[in-house]
């Protein structure tokens, strides 16, 4: 439900601005992919699959640790070795694999953090929509709003979601 669904819908949506068809937004795209993983958990897909649940939790731990390492390197001036050591200690992954990750973060600041930031924004928007709409909240409609605008900055996504739930509240008055 992650990248494939998001990119397929973007390709099918003819009325998107050209910039959204041609330029990918990391926080939106990777955020949607991670959100899809969280959604699977929220819907109970791992309830009868303890190994799948462990994989999900390990993936979430890795994503969170990447955010810390990315921020540590670019905001707090961690050395390459500090970032590698942190990732190895936190995730249990091999030093060689974590060195490759750290090298990627070094040349693409913010990219690793964008996964978690994007997913959290989508989750926050879903929870806000649920609070505002109560029993009128429809998960499918929410996903349609998130996906129908194509890749865009998270601030624009938030505006679209707010416009959607406000219009639903206005219709029910």
PLM regions: where:
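N-terminal maturation segment of proteins
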Residues: 1-173
């Amino acid at each position: 439900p992650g990248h494939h669904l998001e990119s397929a819908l973007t390709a099918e949506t003819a009325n998107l601005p050209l910039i959204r068809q041609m330029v990918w937004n990391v926080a939106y795209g990777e955020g949607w992919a991670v959100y899809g993983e969280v959604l699977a958990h929220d819907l109970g897909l791992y309830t009868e699959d303890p190994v799948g649940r462990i994989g999900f939790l390990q993936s979430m731990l890795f994503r969170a640790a990447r955010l810390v390492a990315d921020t540590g390197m670019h905001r707090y001036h961690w050395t390459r070795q500090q970032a590698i050591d942190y990732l190895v200690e936190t995730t249990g992954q091999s030093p060689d694999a974590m060195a490759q990750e750290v090298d990627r973060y070094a040349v693409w600041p913010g990219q690793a953090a964008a996964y978690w930031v994007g997913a959290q924004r989508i989750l926050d928007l879903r929870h806000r929509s649920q609070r505002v709409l109560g029993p009128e909240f429809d998960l499918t409609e929410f996903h349609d709003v998130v996906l129908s605008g194509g890749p865009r900055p998270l601030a624009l996504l938030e505006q679209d979601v707010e416009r959607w739930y406000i219009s639903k509240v206005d219709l029910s008055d």
